[in-house]
């Protein structure tokens, strides 16, 4: 416990919280242009071909973002919206592409969790 004199000499320093998505610069989402769309393999116990895109953001960063859902229409030069959120089994992928906004279409024939994948309500 410091004395009052010690606190007068140098105040307590705030511990700054390090952000997990620095490329967003405090914004909830950011717009960007895809520079490369490709598949990559996950870490050890899992096996798949995960769809990812390299995106140049309006904040100046170039990040790797995951494309969620089954099937996509994203290609090079597509304008997409990026949100935070990492993919646990893909090292270095700390962002998600938001489906159903800008050039990224929603997932086709999606019945459940539609809002997460930008799918419209099915016709009854």
Curated annotation (Swiss-Prot):
Part of the 30S ribosomal subunit. Residues 1-28, 104-124 are annotated as: Disordered. One of its GO terms (cellular component) is small ribosomal subunit. It holds the Pfam family Ribosom_S12_S23. Residues 11-20, 109-124 have a biased composition (Basic residues). With S4 and S5 plays an important role in translational accuracy. Located at the interface of the 30S and 50S subunits. Gene3D superfamilies: Nucleic acid-binding proteins. The keyword Cell membrane does not apply. InterPro entries: NA-bd_OB-fold, Ribosomal_uS12, Ribosomal_uS12_bac. One of its GO terms (molecular function) is rRNA binding. It is found in: Plastid, Chloroplast. Belongs to the universal ribosomal protein uS12 family. Keywords: Chloroplast, Plastid, Ribonucleoprotein, Ribosomal protein, RNA-binding, rRNA-binding. HAMAP family: Ribosomal_uS12_B. The keyword RNA-binding applies. Disulfide bonds: none annotated. GO terms for biological process: translation. It comes from the Eukaryota. This is Small ribosomal subunit protein uS12c.
């Amino acid at each position: 416990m410091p004395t009052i004199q010690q606190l007068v000499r140098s105040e307590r320093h705030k511990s700054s919280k390090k952000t997990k998505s620095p490329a967003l610069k405090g914004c909830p989402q950011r717009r960007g242009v895809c520079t490369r769309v490709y598949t990559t393999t996950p870490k050890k116990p899992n096996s798949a071909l995960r769809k990812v895109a390299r995106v140049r953001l309006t904040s100046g960063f170039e990040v790797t973002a995951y494309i969620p859902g089954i099937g996509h229409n994203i290609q090079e030069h597509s304008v997409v919206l990026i949100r935070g959120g990492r993919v646990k089994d893909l090292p270095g992928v700390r962002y998600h592409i938001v489906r159903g906004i800008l050039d990224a279409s929603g997932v086709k024939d999606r019945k459940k969790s539609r809002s997460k994948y930008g799918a419209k309500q099915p016709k009854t």
